[in-house]
Amino acid sequence: DPGQVSLSLMNVVLFIIPLVSIVFGTMFFYNSREFMELLLSQPISRVALFLGLYLGLTLPLSAVYLIGVGIPFMYHAGIMTGGYWILLLVGVSLTWVFTALAFFIAVLSEQRVKGIGMTIVLWLFFAILYDGIILFILFALEEYPLEKLTLILSLFNPIDLGRILMLLQFDIAALMGYTGALFSKFYGNMFGSAVAVLALWTWVATPVWLGYRAFSRKDF
């Protein structure tokens, strides 16, 4: 069943793609430092260099993901369902988000070990700790109406947004969790998906912009 395959791949995508993107992105930036210093001595704008490095990494990573996940599924399942397209969209989006976060951290931190450590901690925060913090808040303040607060908090975690997008597409209430059910209740599946996609790509634009701002002021 294509739907079951998509759901099985969901957990792999939500955990492995962000980890690979953020760690590989950080290592790529540090390893390209001498190359960046050489190019900055030429008449090349910093915005062109930064975006060139970013796109030069995210596009191949996205292509590898699309080829590795898309071709086998098309071969075995034929025509892809809507849920599978969402799976591809979420994987590509998370690649762009966490590569942008990796670049931002690598620009801020001069030390390679410190930078890689920060990226791993950030991944752990989004993948595991963030949901635990939300559950603690809900448990501690269970007497208060926290639906809107929970919706707002869910927008600040790109991994949660990807999970919500997938589960809204399949409309599986038992697997949606608290935030997914709230998205479906308050926004409906279609509008909720649109809100999640917009928030996810805001997560791409914001760290890219912050990373460029820091990169443009950095003294190499």
Residue ranges and their predicted role:
Residues 56, 90, 122-126, 199, ...:
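Transmembrane alpha-helical core residues of multi-pass small-molecule transporters
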Residues 101-147:
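Cytoplasmic juxtamembrane interface segments
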Residues 27-58:
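Helix-loop-helix units of permease transmembrane domains in multi-pass membrane transporters
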Residues 21-25, 34-35, 101, 121, ...:
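Hydrophobic/aromatic residues in alpha-helical transmembrane segments
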Residues 130-205, 209-213:
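Terminal transmembrane helical anchor/hairpin motif
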Residues 214-220:
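Short cytosolic juxtamembrane segments of multi-pass membrane proteins
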Residues 6-32:
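Long, hydrophobic alpha-helical segments
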